[in-house]
């Protein structure tokens, strides 16, 4: 777009954004002019009219009070994000690509991992080198020992350390008592022991016995937004309460020890991580809350077999359990994302972008079928983007298809580099990065978007209620000076 046309578009967007003010301005001027012409006699006549029509006046105020009451009772209750906390694993669990591959070779030499050829080792190493992950991501202790420890007890220890650590830090930062929590929602896709993870938190923090608790399983990397949406729904029913949302994934029990290439990819991408989020519907909490939840949009295309089967946990030909990623995954993800954007767009985009979309649609429909679809400028709707750090290719495609800048996807790339794919909690590490960089100001709008098995694409939209500073023990506070880093890898090699 050349410079003159760009200026025209900016001016048009400004007109559309302030259309109501511009429309009402002439009306207000006319009212002011007419009011200035009123005489003292006109005002006295109006006063006498009110004195002689008590019944009409009473009915007017009665209807006004009734309407106001009904509006206040039926309108959606605001949901505030008081604070959130991301888990930072201990430093001894850091594992570079070299350390990981050395350990894999030792495991293989010990006979615990019977890979058929060196080709699979080279495949894993290439995935690690090109994934966008850095050299300080965290691998569970049970996977850094010889022999590997993948039993239920060790897996439970990993998850307990993550969720308890995140929640404990959240309680310390907010000063909230565990007994104040009325709603608890926990999500973990592939690790769901009995008692549940939500029960672990109830027991550890002695949460009250009438708490409304949910434990979401098997819902993939997009489950963090699903958990937020579930908590939002419960907060519409239960007044003056707090909701605690916890998102995590277990790595220990999900290491794949077979020879299927489509199942080895997840070994290379997923790392330890988890987040705890405190929500509130109490009006008094607005003053100290960081954000207000504006929208949640959920899309599930599982009715289509290709969507349903593109990411599944299953046994390979040798009976070894892993998560298989099909070749249809990019196509399915693009289709599901498109539906989510089509649903979210009308809710958040300014009318100018809706107008451009409509014009392009008419041209394509009636004049030129080969014309490309109009891609809305989502930077007019959001200041910050938290795109699920599922992998470098995913972030690249989102940047390209949504016409984003490197700065727009910086939080996602740096989260992938520093922490790896932490599944449903990655969008919270990204938000923590934005806060740590001091970029979050009052009124800023944030788009969190995550994709996961099923196949699902879910979005949440927040607005900052103040200039947000990073909370104590922000996961980036010890390494922020290193970021952003330059990531230059040729994926075509």
From Swiss-Prot:
Belongs to the thiolase-like superfamily. Chalcone/stilbene synthases family. One of its GO terms (molecular function) is fatty acid elongase activity. The gene is KCS16. Pathway: Lipid metabolism; fatty acid biosynthesis. It is found in: Membrane. This is 3-ketoacyl-CoA synthase 16. GO terms for cellular component: membrane. It comes from the Eukaryota. CDD domains: CHS_like. The keyword Glycosyltransferase does not apply. Residues 1-35 form the signal peptide. Residues 71-366 form the FAE domain. Its EC number is 2.3.1.199. One of its GO terms (biological process) is response to light stimulus. Keywords: Acyltransferase, Membrane, Signal, Transferase, Transmembrane, Transmembrane helix. Gene3D superfamilies: 3.40.47.10. The active site is at 221, 300, 384, 388, 417, 421. It catalyses: a very-long-chain acyl-CoA + malonyl-CoA + H(+) = a very-long-chain 3-oxoacyl-CoA + CO2 + CoA. It is a single-pass membrane protein. Induction: Repressed by herbicides such as flufenacet and benfuresate. Up-regulated by osmotic stress and down-regulated by low temperature, salt and darkness. The keyword Transferase applies. It comes from Arabidopsis thaliana (Mouse-ear cress). Expressed in siliques. The chain crosses the membrane at residues 52-74. It is an enzyme of class 2 (transferase).
